[in-house]
């Protein structure tokens, strides 16, 4: 979840990575002691392409990589928190967005992700937590799409008269 969050945060800024850059960035983010070996390069490169294709899709069916509903709530909440932190890390790592480019809506979303990155304390879990979790994941999904399209708008060709 954290790696997907990082990648989507990075891509949302309009930045793209070469294969070599992605291999280096992902290995560093995951704190791998060695770079990706030959067997693991293909899946991580495929992950990049799949995520980019999904977030760019016209059908807006991008989904967050979360553990299944069969997992304990704490495990799912931890993954969601890691996704949100990853998004913020990737968004910042791109270095493409100046403070002047951050609208009020974008700032609000970034603040939400910051709050999400802290998760829900075990003491705060009750019968409404499951519903709240589902709503938070959907909110993150929709706002990730918003962020991507906000900073990745196609450049309009000037109209010649």
Regions found by a protein language model. Name each.
Residues 1-161:
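Domain-length accessory/inserted modules outside core catalytic folds
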């Amino acid at each position: 979840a954290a790696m997907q969050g990082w990648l989507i945060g990075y891509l949302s800024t309009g930045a793209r990575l070469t294969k070599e850059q992605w291999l280096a960035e992902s290995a560093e983010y995951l704190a791998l002691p060695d770079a990706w070996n030959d067997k693991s390069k293909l899946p991580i490169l495929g992950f990049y392409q799949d995520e980019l294709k999904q977030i760019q899709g016209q059908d807006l069916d991008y989904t967050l990589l979360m553990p299944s509903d069969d997992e304990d709530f704490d495990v799912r909440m931890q993954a969601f928190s890691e996704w949100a932190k990853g998004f913020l890390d990737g968004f910042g790592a791109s270095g493409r967005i100046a403070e002047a480019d951050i609208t009020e809506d974008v700032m609000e979303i970034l603040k939400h992700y910051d709050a999400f990155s802290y998760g829900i304390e075990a003491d705060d879990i009750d019968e409404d937590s499951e519903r709240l979790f589902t709503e938070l994941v959907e909110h993150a999904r929709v706002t990730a799409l918003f962020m991507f399209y906000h900073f990745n708008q196609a450049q309009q060709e000037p109209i010649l008269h």
